[in-house]
Regions:
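Soluble acyl-CoA-dependent acyltransferase catalytic core bearing the H(X)4D motif
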Residues: 1-8, 24-39, 44-230
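Short beta-strand/turn micro-motifs at beta-sheet edges
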Residues: 11-17
Length: 230
């Protein structure tokens, strides 16, 4: 298992039905450049190979009522790609307006917390074209902010999409592993009990910083005002 950080867990705590906290990206693909042509099944098979190297896409949340710390990530033993890779068609004429409406609806729907916190939507019918005949295709990826930030999201995107068409898929990467409720609670208790010592360790540095700041303020050597630095 892998324990969430306080920042990552906060994205779970402040999320609400009207304020989903996931990150979305949209790619527009020209399928005429795909060697051998595009089919949805082929895209699915290629994605499955890459997900084996992306443990974030195979991990789900786990917690215990006795847990005094943040939730954890565990491997989803029942992971099913078909629950995350979804397919939809744009209504005619398949323009930017129709695409924006579909993407807005997808983005407004919260992710299912009982599964790995991501979805990928394959949107066909862009500009009234058929992707199987070399038309355009949009792919919208939605990942919870508790699982990725800006840098992590960019790294995941680079694993899903390569600059060269014939690059082999990356080697599989092990996930966070398993954990039962008792293990989650026990490790959470240990972390909770260690917090006073962690606080004691940072207190000297914090006090020294406060004293230094007060001395600088008394001598007029304060920090420059916003937008007022050299």
């Amino acid at each position: 298992m892998e324990r969430l950080s306080g920042l990552d867990a906060s994205f779970l705590y402040i999320e609400s039905p009207t304020q989903p906290l996931h990150v979305c990206s949209i790619l527009e693909l020209d399928t005429s450049t795909v060697p051998g042509g595009y089919t949805f099944d082929r895209l699915r098979d290629e994605l499955a190979l890459r997900i084996a190297a992306i443990p974030e896409f195979r991990a789900k949340l786990a917690d215990s009522q006795l847990n005094l710390d943040y939730p954890v990530w565990v491997e989803d033993d029942a992971f099913d790609l078909d629950r995350h890779l979804l397919r939809i068609g744009l209504p005619s004429p398949g323009g930017r307006r129709e695409l924006a409406e579909i993407c807005g609806h997808i983005a407004s729907t919260p992710l299912d917390r009982s599964r790995p916190l991501w979805e990928m939507w394959v949107i066909e019918g862009v500009a009234d074209t058929d992707p199987r005949a070399g038309g355009l295709l949009a792919v919208m990826t939605k990942v919870h902010h508790a699982a990725v930030d800006g840098v992590t999201g960019a790294n995941l995107l680079s694993q899903l999409c390569t600059a060269e068409p014939d690059v082999p898929p990356p080697e599989p990467v092990e996930g966070p592993g398993k954990a039962g409720p008792l293990q989650i609670a026990a490790s959470g208790l240990v972390r909770f009990a260690s917090r006073p010592w962690q606080l004691a360790n940072v207190m000297p540095t914090t006090v020294a910083t406060i004293v230094k700041t007060v001395r600088r303020a008394r001598t007029g050597l304060t920090m420059a005002a916003p937008f007022g630095g050299p």
